[in-house]
Amino acid sequence: FNLSLKNYIRDKINDVRESYPWEKFYITNYHQFIKSEANNYNLPIKGLTSYTDINFFEPVKNHIKKYKAIFIDEVQDYQTEWLEIITKYFIYEDSEFVVFGDEKQNIYRRPLDENKEPVIKTIAGNWNKSLNASKRFTSEIGKLAMKFQHHFLESKYTIDDMVVLDNPILDFEQRNIKYANIGTEASTERIFNIYKGTCKKYCLNPADITILSGTADILREVEYFIKTQLKENTTTTFETKEEYDKSKVETHSKNNFEERINTIRRYRRNHFSIKTGTAKLSSIHSFKGWESHTVFLIIEPHRSDSIQDFESVELI
């Protein structure tokens, strides 16, 4: 479901100084997994409903290859039916089935239980909340995150009991937290100039930079300025301005236009990597950017005409 996450997970495993048998790892996202398994057993995918049909694999249930261990990250993004399909057809009774999630990142409005936590019908008992010590955040960002949760999310979710270490193991030296209130009508050029000025002031390497926003609309324009004004390459999870404009001219309906744009985005997300040596631009849905040395977060006003129309405090 989160296409770029699979490359990130592979990179993190690769960072461990061990010789892993990569043929034993199958790292993918939900929809690609189901599509691949359906192809393996000659089952036709009949639209999005096939991905939520808990009996979809019933005709071939006795032939399906099962897994001794399945790990799911960002499980708050998953529909309940997806988890039922996985546990019904792809694990043994004694398989290891582990999910990781954070209901405060519930950007797709999945249902929560009476404890305001993700609903995982296939796993009994309470959530294990022992992973509460931040390994990445410095005290400055950790304290900011806690204040943000209490102010905006306390009425909707159970707030983290997070331990913020003064010297986290994965300390990425994120020390400066700066704000620029540029109003709702600020031009892309002004945002770009703030970016350029900050890079110059702090001598930032483009490889250490991630630019995030809720949608691709403004990121596309910022990326265009970086390429044309700074003459720098970039890595994105979305189409370029040139591709966007060309698609508008060449397609003759809104559906065809959106289909072409979504095809480009799927390809970019599938090949997105944090180890590119260039500045990275992404929607928060595809990459959260916390492993970057420097993150520029653009909080846009509500846009009803966006291809992906999201406005959510969970994104921030």
Language model features with spans:
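Conserved helicase NTPase motor core
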Residues: 23-115, 289
